[in-house]
Design a protein with these regions (language model features):
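Accessory nucleic-acid engagement/destabilization modules that flank
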Residues: 2-20, 24-264
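Conserved pre-motif I regulatory segment
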Residues: 265-304
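Walker A/P-loop
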Residues: 297-319, 450, 476
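Conserved Walker A/P-loop ATP-binding site and its immediately adjacent core
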Residues: 329-353, 366-372, 479-483, 565
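A substrate-engagement module of RecA-like helicase motors
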Residues: 348-413, 417-421
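Conserved interdomain linker/interface between the two RecA-like ATPase lobes of SF2 helicase motors
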Residues: 495-570
Length: 640
């Protein structure tokens, strides 16, 4: 047992340099991060994640919690090293801090780590923890997997050669420094009661476990590193400090899906989507909802139905049912383009407002690179403004979540599909993406539209989601059988299931894949099904003009989709002369702001959620392929 007297220097060593008024010590930062991680586990991490981790590692949920909180509490122990402490920026505190360390026997002479060696504090933390775990009797490969969590808390793991060098450096380290490092780990181990749990872990942690615990440690570290929330100088008790800090950050809580669930399908759709009493859910919506409510464990749910059949509402209703059944705390809805994501955002937020319990506050995020141009999302980002109305919960774009790396941690996110597929890549801080997706229901739209390259990433992503026991809902109008079989097999391969072949040629079609097998259910076409006539016309402007005149004589809306921007511009110039004030041009060459304005106007005029004050008797849209994929509008005629 290391003497508690060695904890004193940990309260002198700096973690955050501060200014003349004070600095934050390593010990205080570790205590802050430990306590934040504890709160996040209790109030933010979904029950589905907790149970998945416990089952995977053959531990109790409380034991996984203790391990995660312990690792958060020692993630920066590597800052108690000569090389890090000497990095303190020049200022009024520098001489005082360094002098205090030397006064307690921690010499600051240049060591081997400062002579061309790569020795960042995250790597040092990992090696220090690894050595401590070995002393507890843990097998080396197991200790390496646990230590990798603190090694990666800055987003990327170290190379093996760097790890070996760091071990060599610490083997030659002055004893007093090693004693202080050990004292910090011992104190955190005692505070979290983790030692008996360490003795139970006999095999290496699974990679998904490492990803999620690392994501939690990163989130806790980022919260505790917020100087406004956790000031360097304070005079309150630690519990109050953590409570006030998280409150000032505005961290969202869990979505209590069970509180707003309705057992009757018609009652649910009326409440969740604001439908009038005389509206009935379509058969595909009723069955998708019922199948999700009857699910048992992780499921892949594929909904194949025509455009305009209500797949979006069916998916959201099924997502709510899955969330209630499996303890998920949110929904991610991924669309193929920014335009379709923008169009979905308002619909998802309106649904979320209706399914969040009254008095609760949840976070929302629009996940793509141009979200700053979307007025609906920016409106939610204004602090204190939400869609809260009488009897409904609050859905707000909270400031802490409003960044690319943290956005998917929000309860409700609408994204472009790449934001989900990137979980299959190696990228910095990707653990946060895993943490954000693991506790949710994931909906992916237009899966038939992705090429072979994108589909390969989609299959890898489905494997990750199956590892985390995430319910996944795939939407498609025309999904080829071979692609569906590949997607089903990707998800089920993690569950240890055999290959599967589709046997149904029904349409619309619902497919459920889980550990119990694969079930296909075809449905009768409802009375509101859309039928389309397809014909081929000549490739001249004159024939296009004549066709528009013939088809839209008595009113209606048409979309003319061209293969190139130049062709769209030429067709627009020709049509606008014949139909002034009735033609809009959309294509990818507009600057981002102008494109966002045009897309917003089109969705307001023609989208699923139209302005009641705007009725267009005649309307024509000319655009490139982007307009055809991403319009999300209701049109009577589509030409290509």
């Amino acid at each position: 047992m290391v003497g508690e007297s060695f904890l004193g220097p940990a309260s002198l060593a700096w973690a955050k340099p501060g200014d003349d008024s004070g600095y934050l010590s390593v010990w205080q930062h570790l205590v802050d991060t430990r306590d934040v991680a504890s709160r996040l586990w209790d109030t933010f991490v979904a029950d589905s994640i907790k149970q998945s981790l416990a089952t995977t590692e053959r531990l109790e949920v409380s034991e996984v919690r203790a391990l995660a909180v312990f690792l958060a509490g020692i993630h920066d122990v590597g800052k108690i090293t000569r090389s890090f402490q000497r990095k303190i920026p020049p200022g009024a505190n520098a001489e005082m801090i360094l002098g205090s360390l030397e006064d307690v026997g921690l010499d600051l002479e240049f060591g081997i780590e400062e002579v061309g060696a790569y020795f960042p504090h995250g790597l040092a933390s990992s090696v220090i923890l690894y050595d401590w775990l070995l002393k507890q009797g843990m097998w080396g490969p197991v200790a390496e997997t646990i230590a990798s969590v603190v090694e990666s808390h800055h987003g990327i793991p170290a190379r093996t050669v760097d790890y070996d060098r760091a071990r060599a450096i610490l083997r030659e380290y002055p004893e007093n420094w090693l004693l202080v490092q050990a004292a910090v780990i011992e104190a955190m181990a005692d505070a979290t009661e983790v030692k008996p749990i360490i003795g139970k872990i006999q095999s290496e942690l699974f990679v998904p476990t490492i990803q999620l615990i690392t994501g939690l440690v990163i989130a806790a570290d980022w919260c505790a590193s917020n100087e406004r929330a956790f000031p360097y100088v304070f005079d309150c008790e630690q519990e109050q400090r953590v409570q006030d800090g998280l409150a000032s950050i505005g961290f969202a809580g869990l979505w209590s899906a069970s509180k707003t669930m309705k057992p009757d399908v018609a009652e649910y759709f009326a409440a969740a989507f604001g439908w009038p009493d005389e509206w009935d859910p379509r058969p595909i919506q009723q069955r998708a909802f019922a199948q999700a409510r009857g699910s048992d464990g992780a499921s892949l749910h594929i909904i194949e139905a025509s455009t305009g059949s209500g797949k979006t509402e069916a998916a959201l209703a099924a997502a709510h049912a899955y969330a209630e059944k499996h303890g998920c705390h949110g929904v991610v809805f991924a669309a193929p383009t920014m335009a379709t994501a923008n169009g979905l955002f308002n619909r998802v937020i309106q649904w979320a407002q209706n399914v969040v319990p009254a008095g609760d506050t949840t976070a929302a995020y629009l996940a793509h690179s141009m979200n700053s141009l979307v007025k609906e999302y920016q409106r939610l980002r204004v602090k204190g403004v939400s869609t809260d109305t009488s009897g409904n919960g609050s859905v707000t774009a909270m400031e802490w979540f409003a960044s690319p790396k943290k956005g998917l941690l929000s309860n409700f996110a609408v994204s472009t599909v790449d934001q989900v597929l990137m979980m299959a890549l190696q990228s910095r801080h990707n653990m946060l993406r895993h943490l954000g997706l693991a506790g949710k229901v994931v909906i992916i739209d237009e899966v038939h539209a992705y090429d072979s390259f994108t589909s390969a990433y989609l299959e890898s992503t489905l494997k990750w989601l199956a590892w985390y026991e995430v319910p996944v809902i795939l939407l498609s109008a025309t999904l080829p059988v071979d692609k569906k079989e590949s997607l089903v097999q990707a998800y089920r391969s993690v569950l240890g299931e055999e290959d599967w072949e589709s046997v149904s040629d029904g349409y619309p079609l619902l497919t459920i894949a889980d550990a119990n097998g694969v079930r296909e259910e075809s449905l009768d076409i409802g009375p509101n099904e859309i039928h389309a006539d397809v014909s081929v016309i000549g490739d001249t402007d004159r024939e296009l003009l004549t066709l528009c005149e013939e088809l839209l004589t008595d009113g209606g809306c048409a979309l003319v989709v061209c293969n190139t921007v130049r062709r769209a511009q030429n067709s627009y110039s020709m049509l606008v002369k014949k139909f002034p004030d009735e033609v809009e041009l959309h294509h990818a060459a507009f600057i981002a702001h102008e494109r966002a304005v045009k897309e917003g106007k089109m969705l307001q005029q023609l989208g699923p959620v139209k302005s009641a004050d705007v009725v267009y008797e005649f309307f024509r849209i000319v655009g490139d392929r982007l307009a055809g994929i991403g319009s999300g509008t209701g049109l009577g005629v589509v030409g290509h």
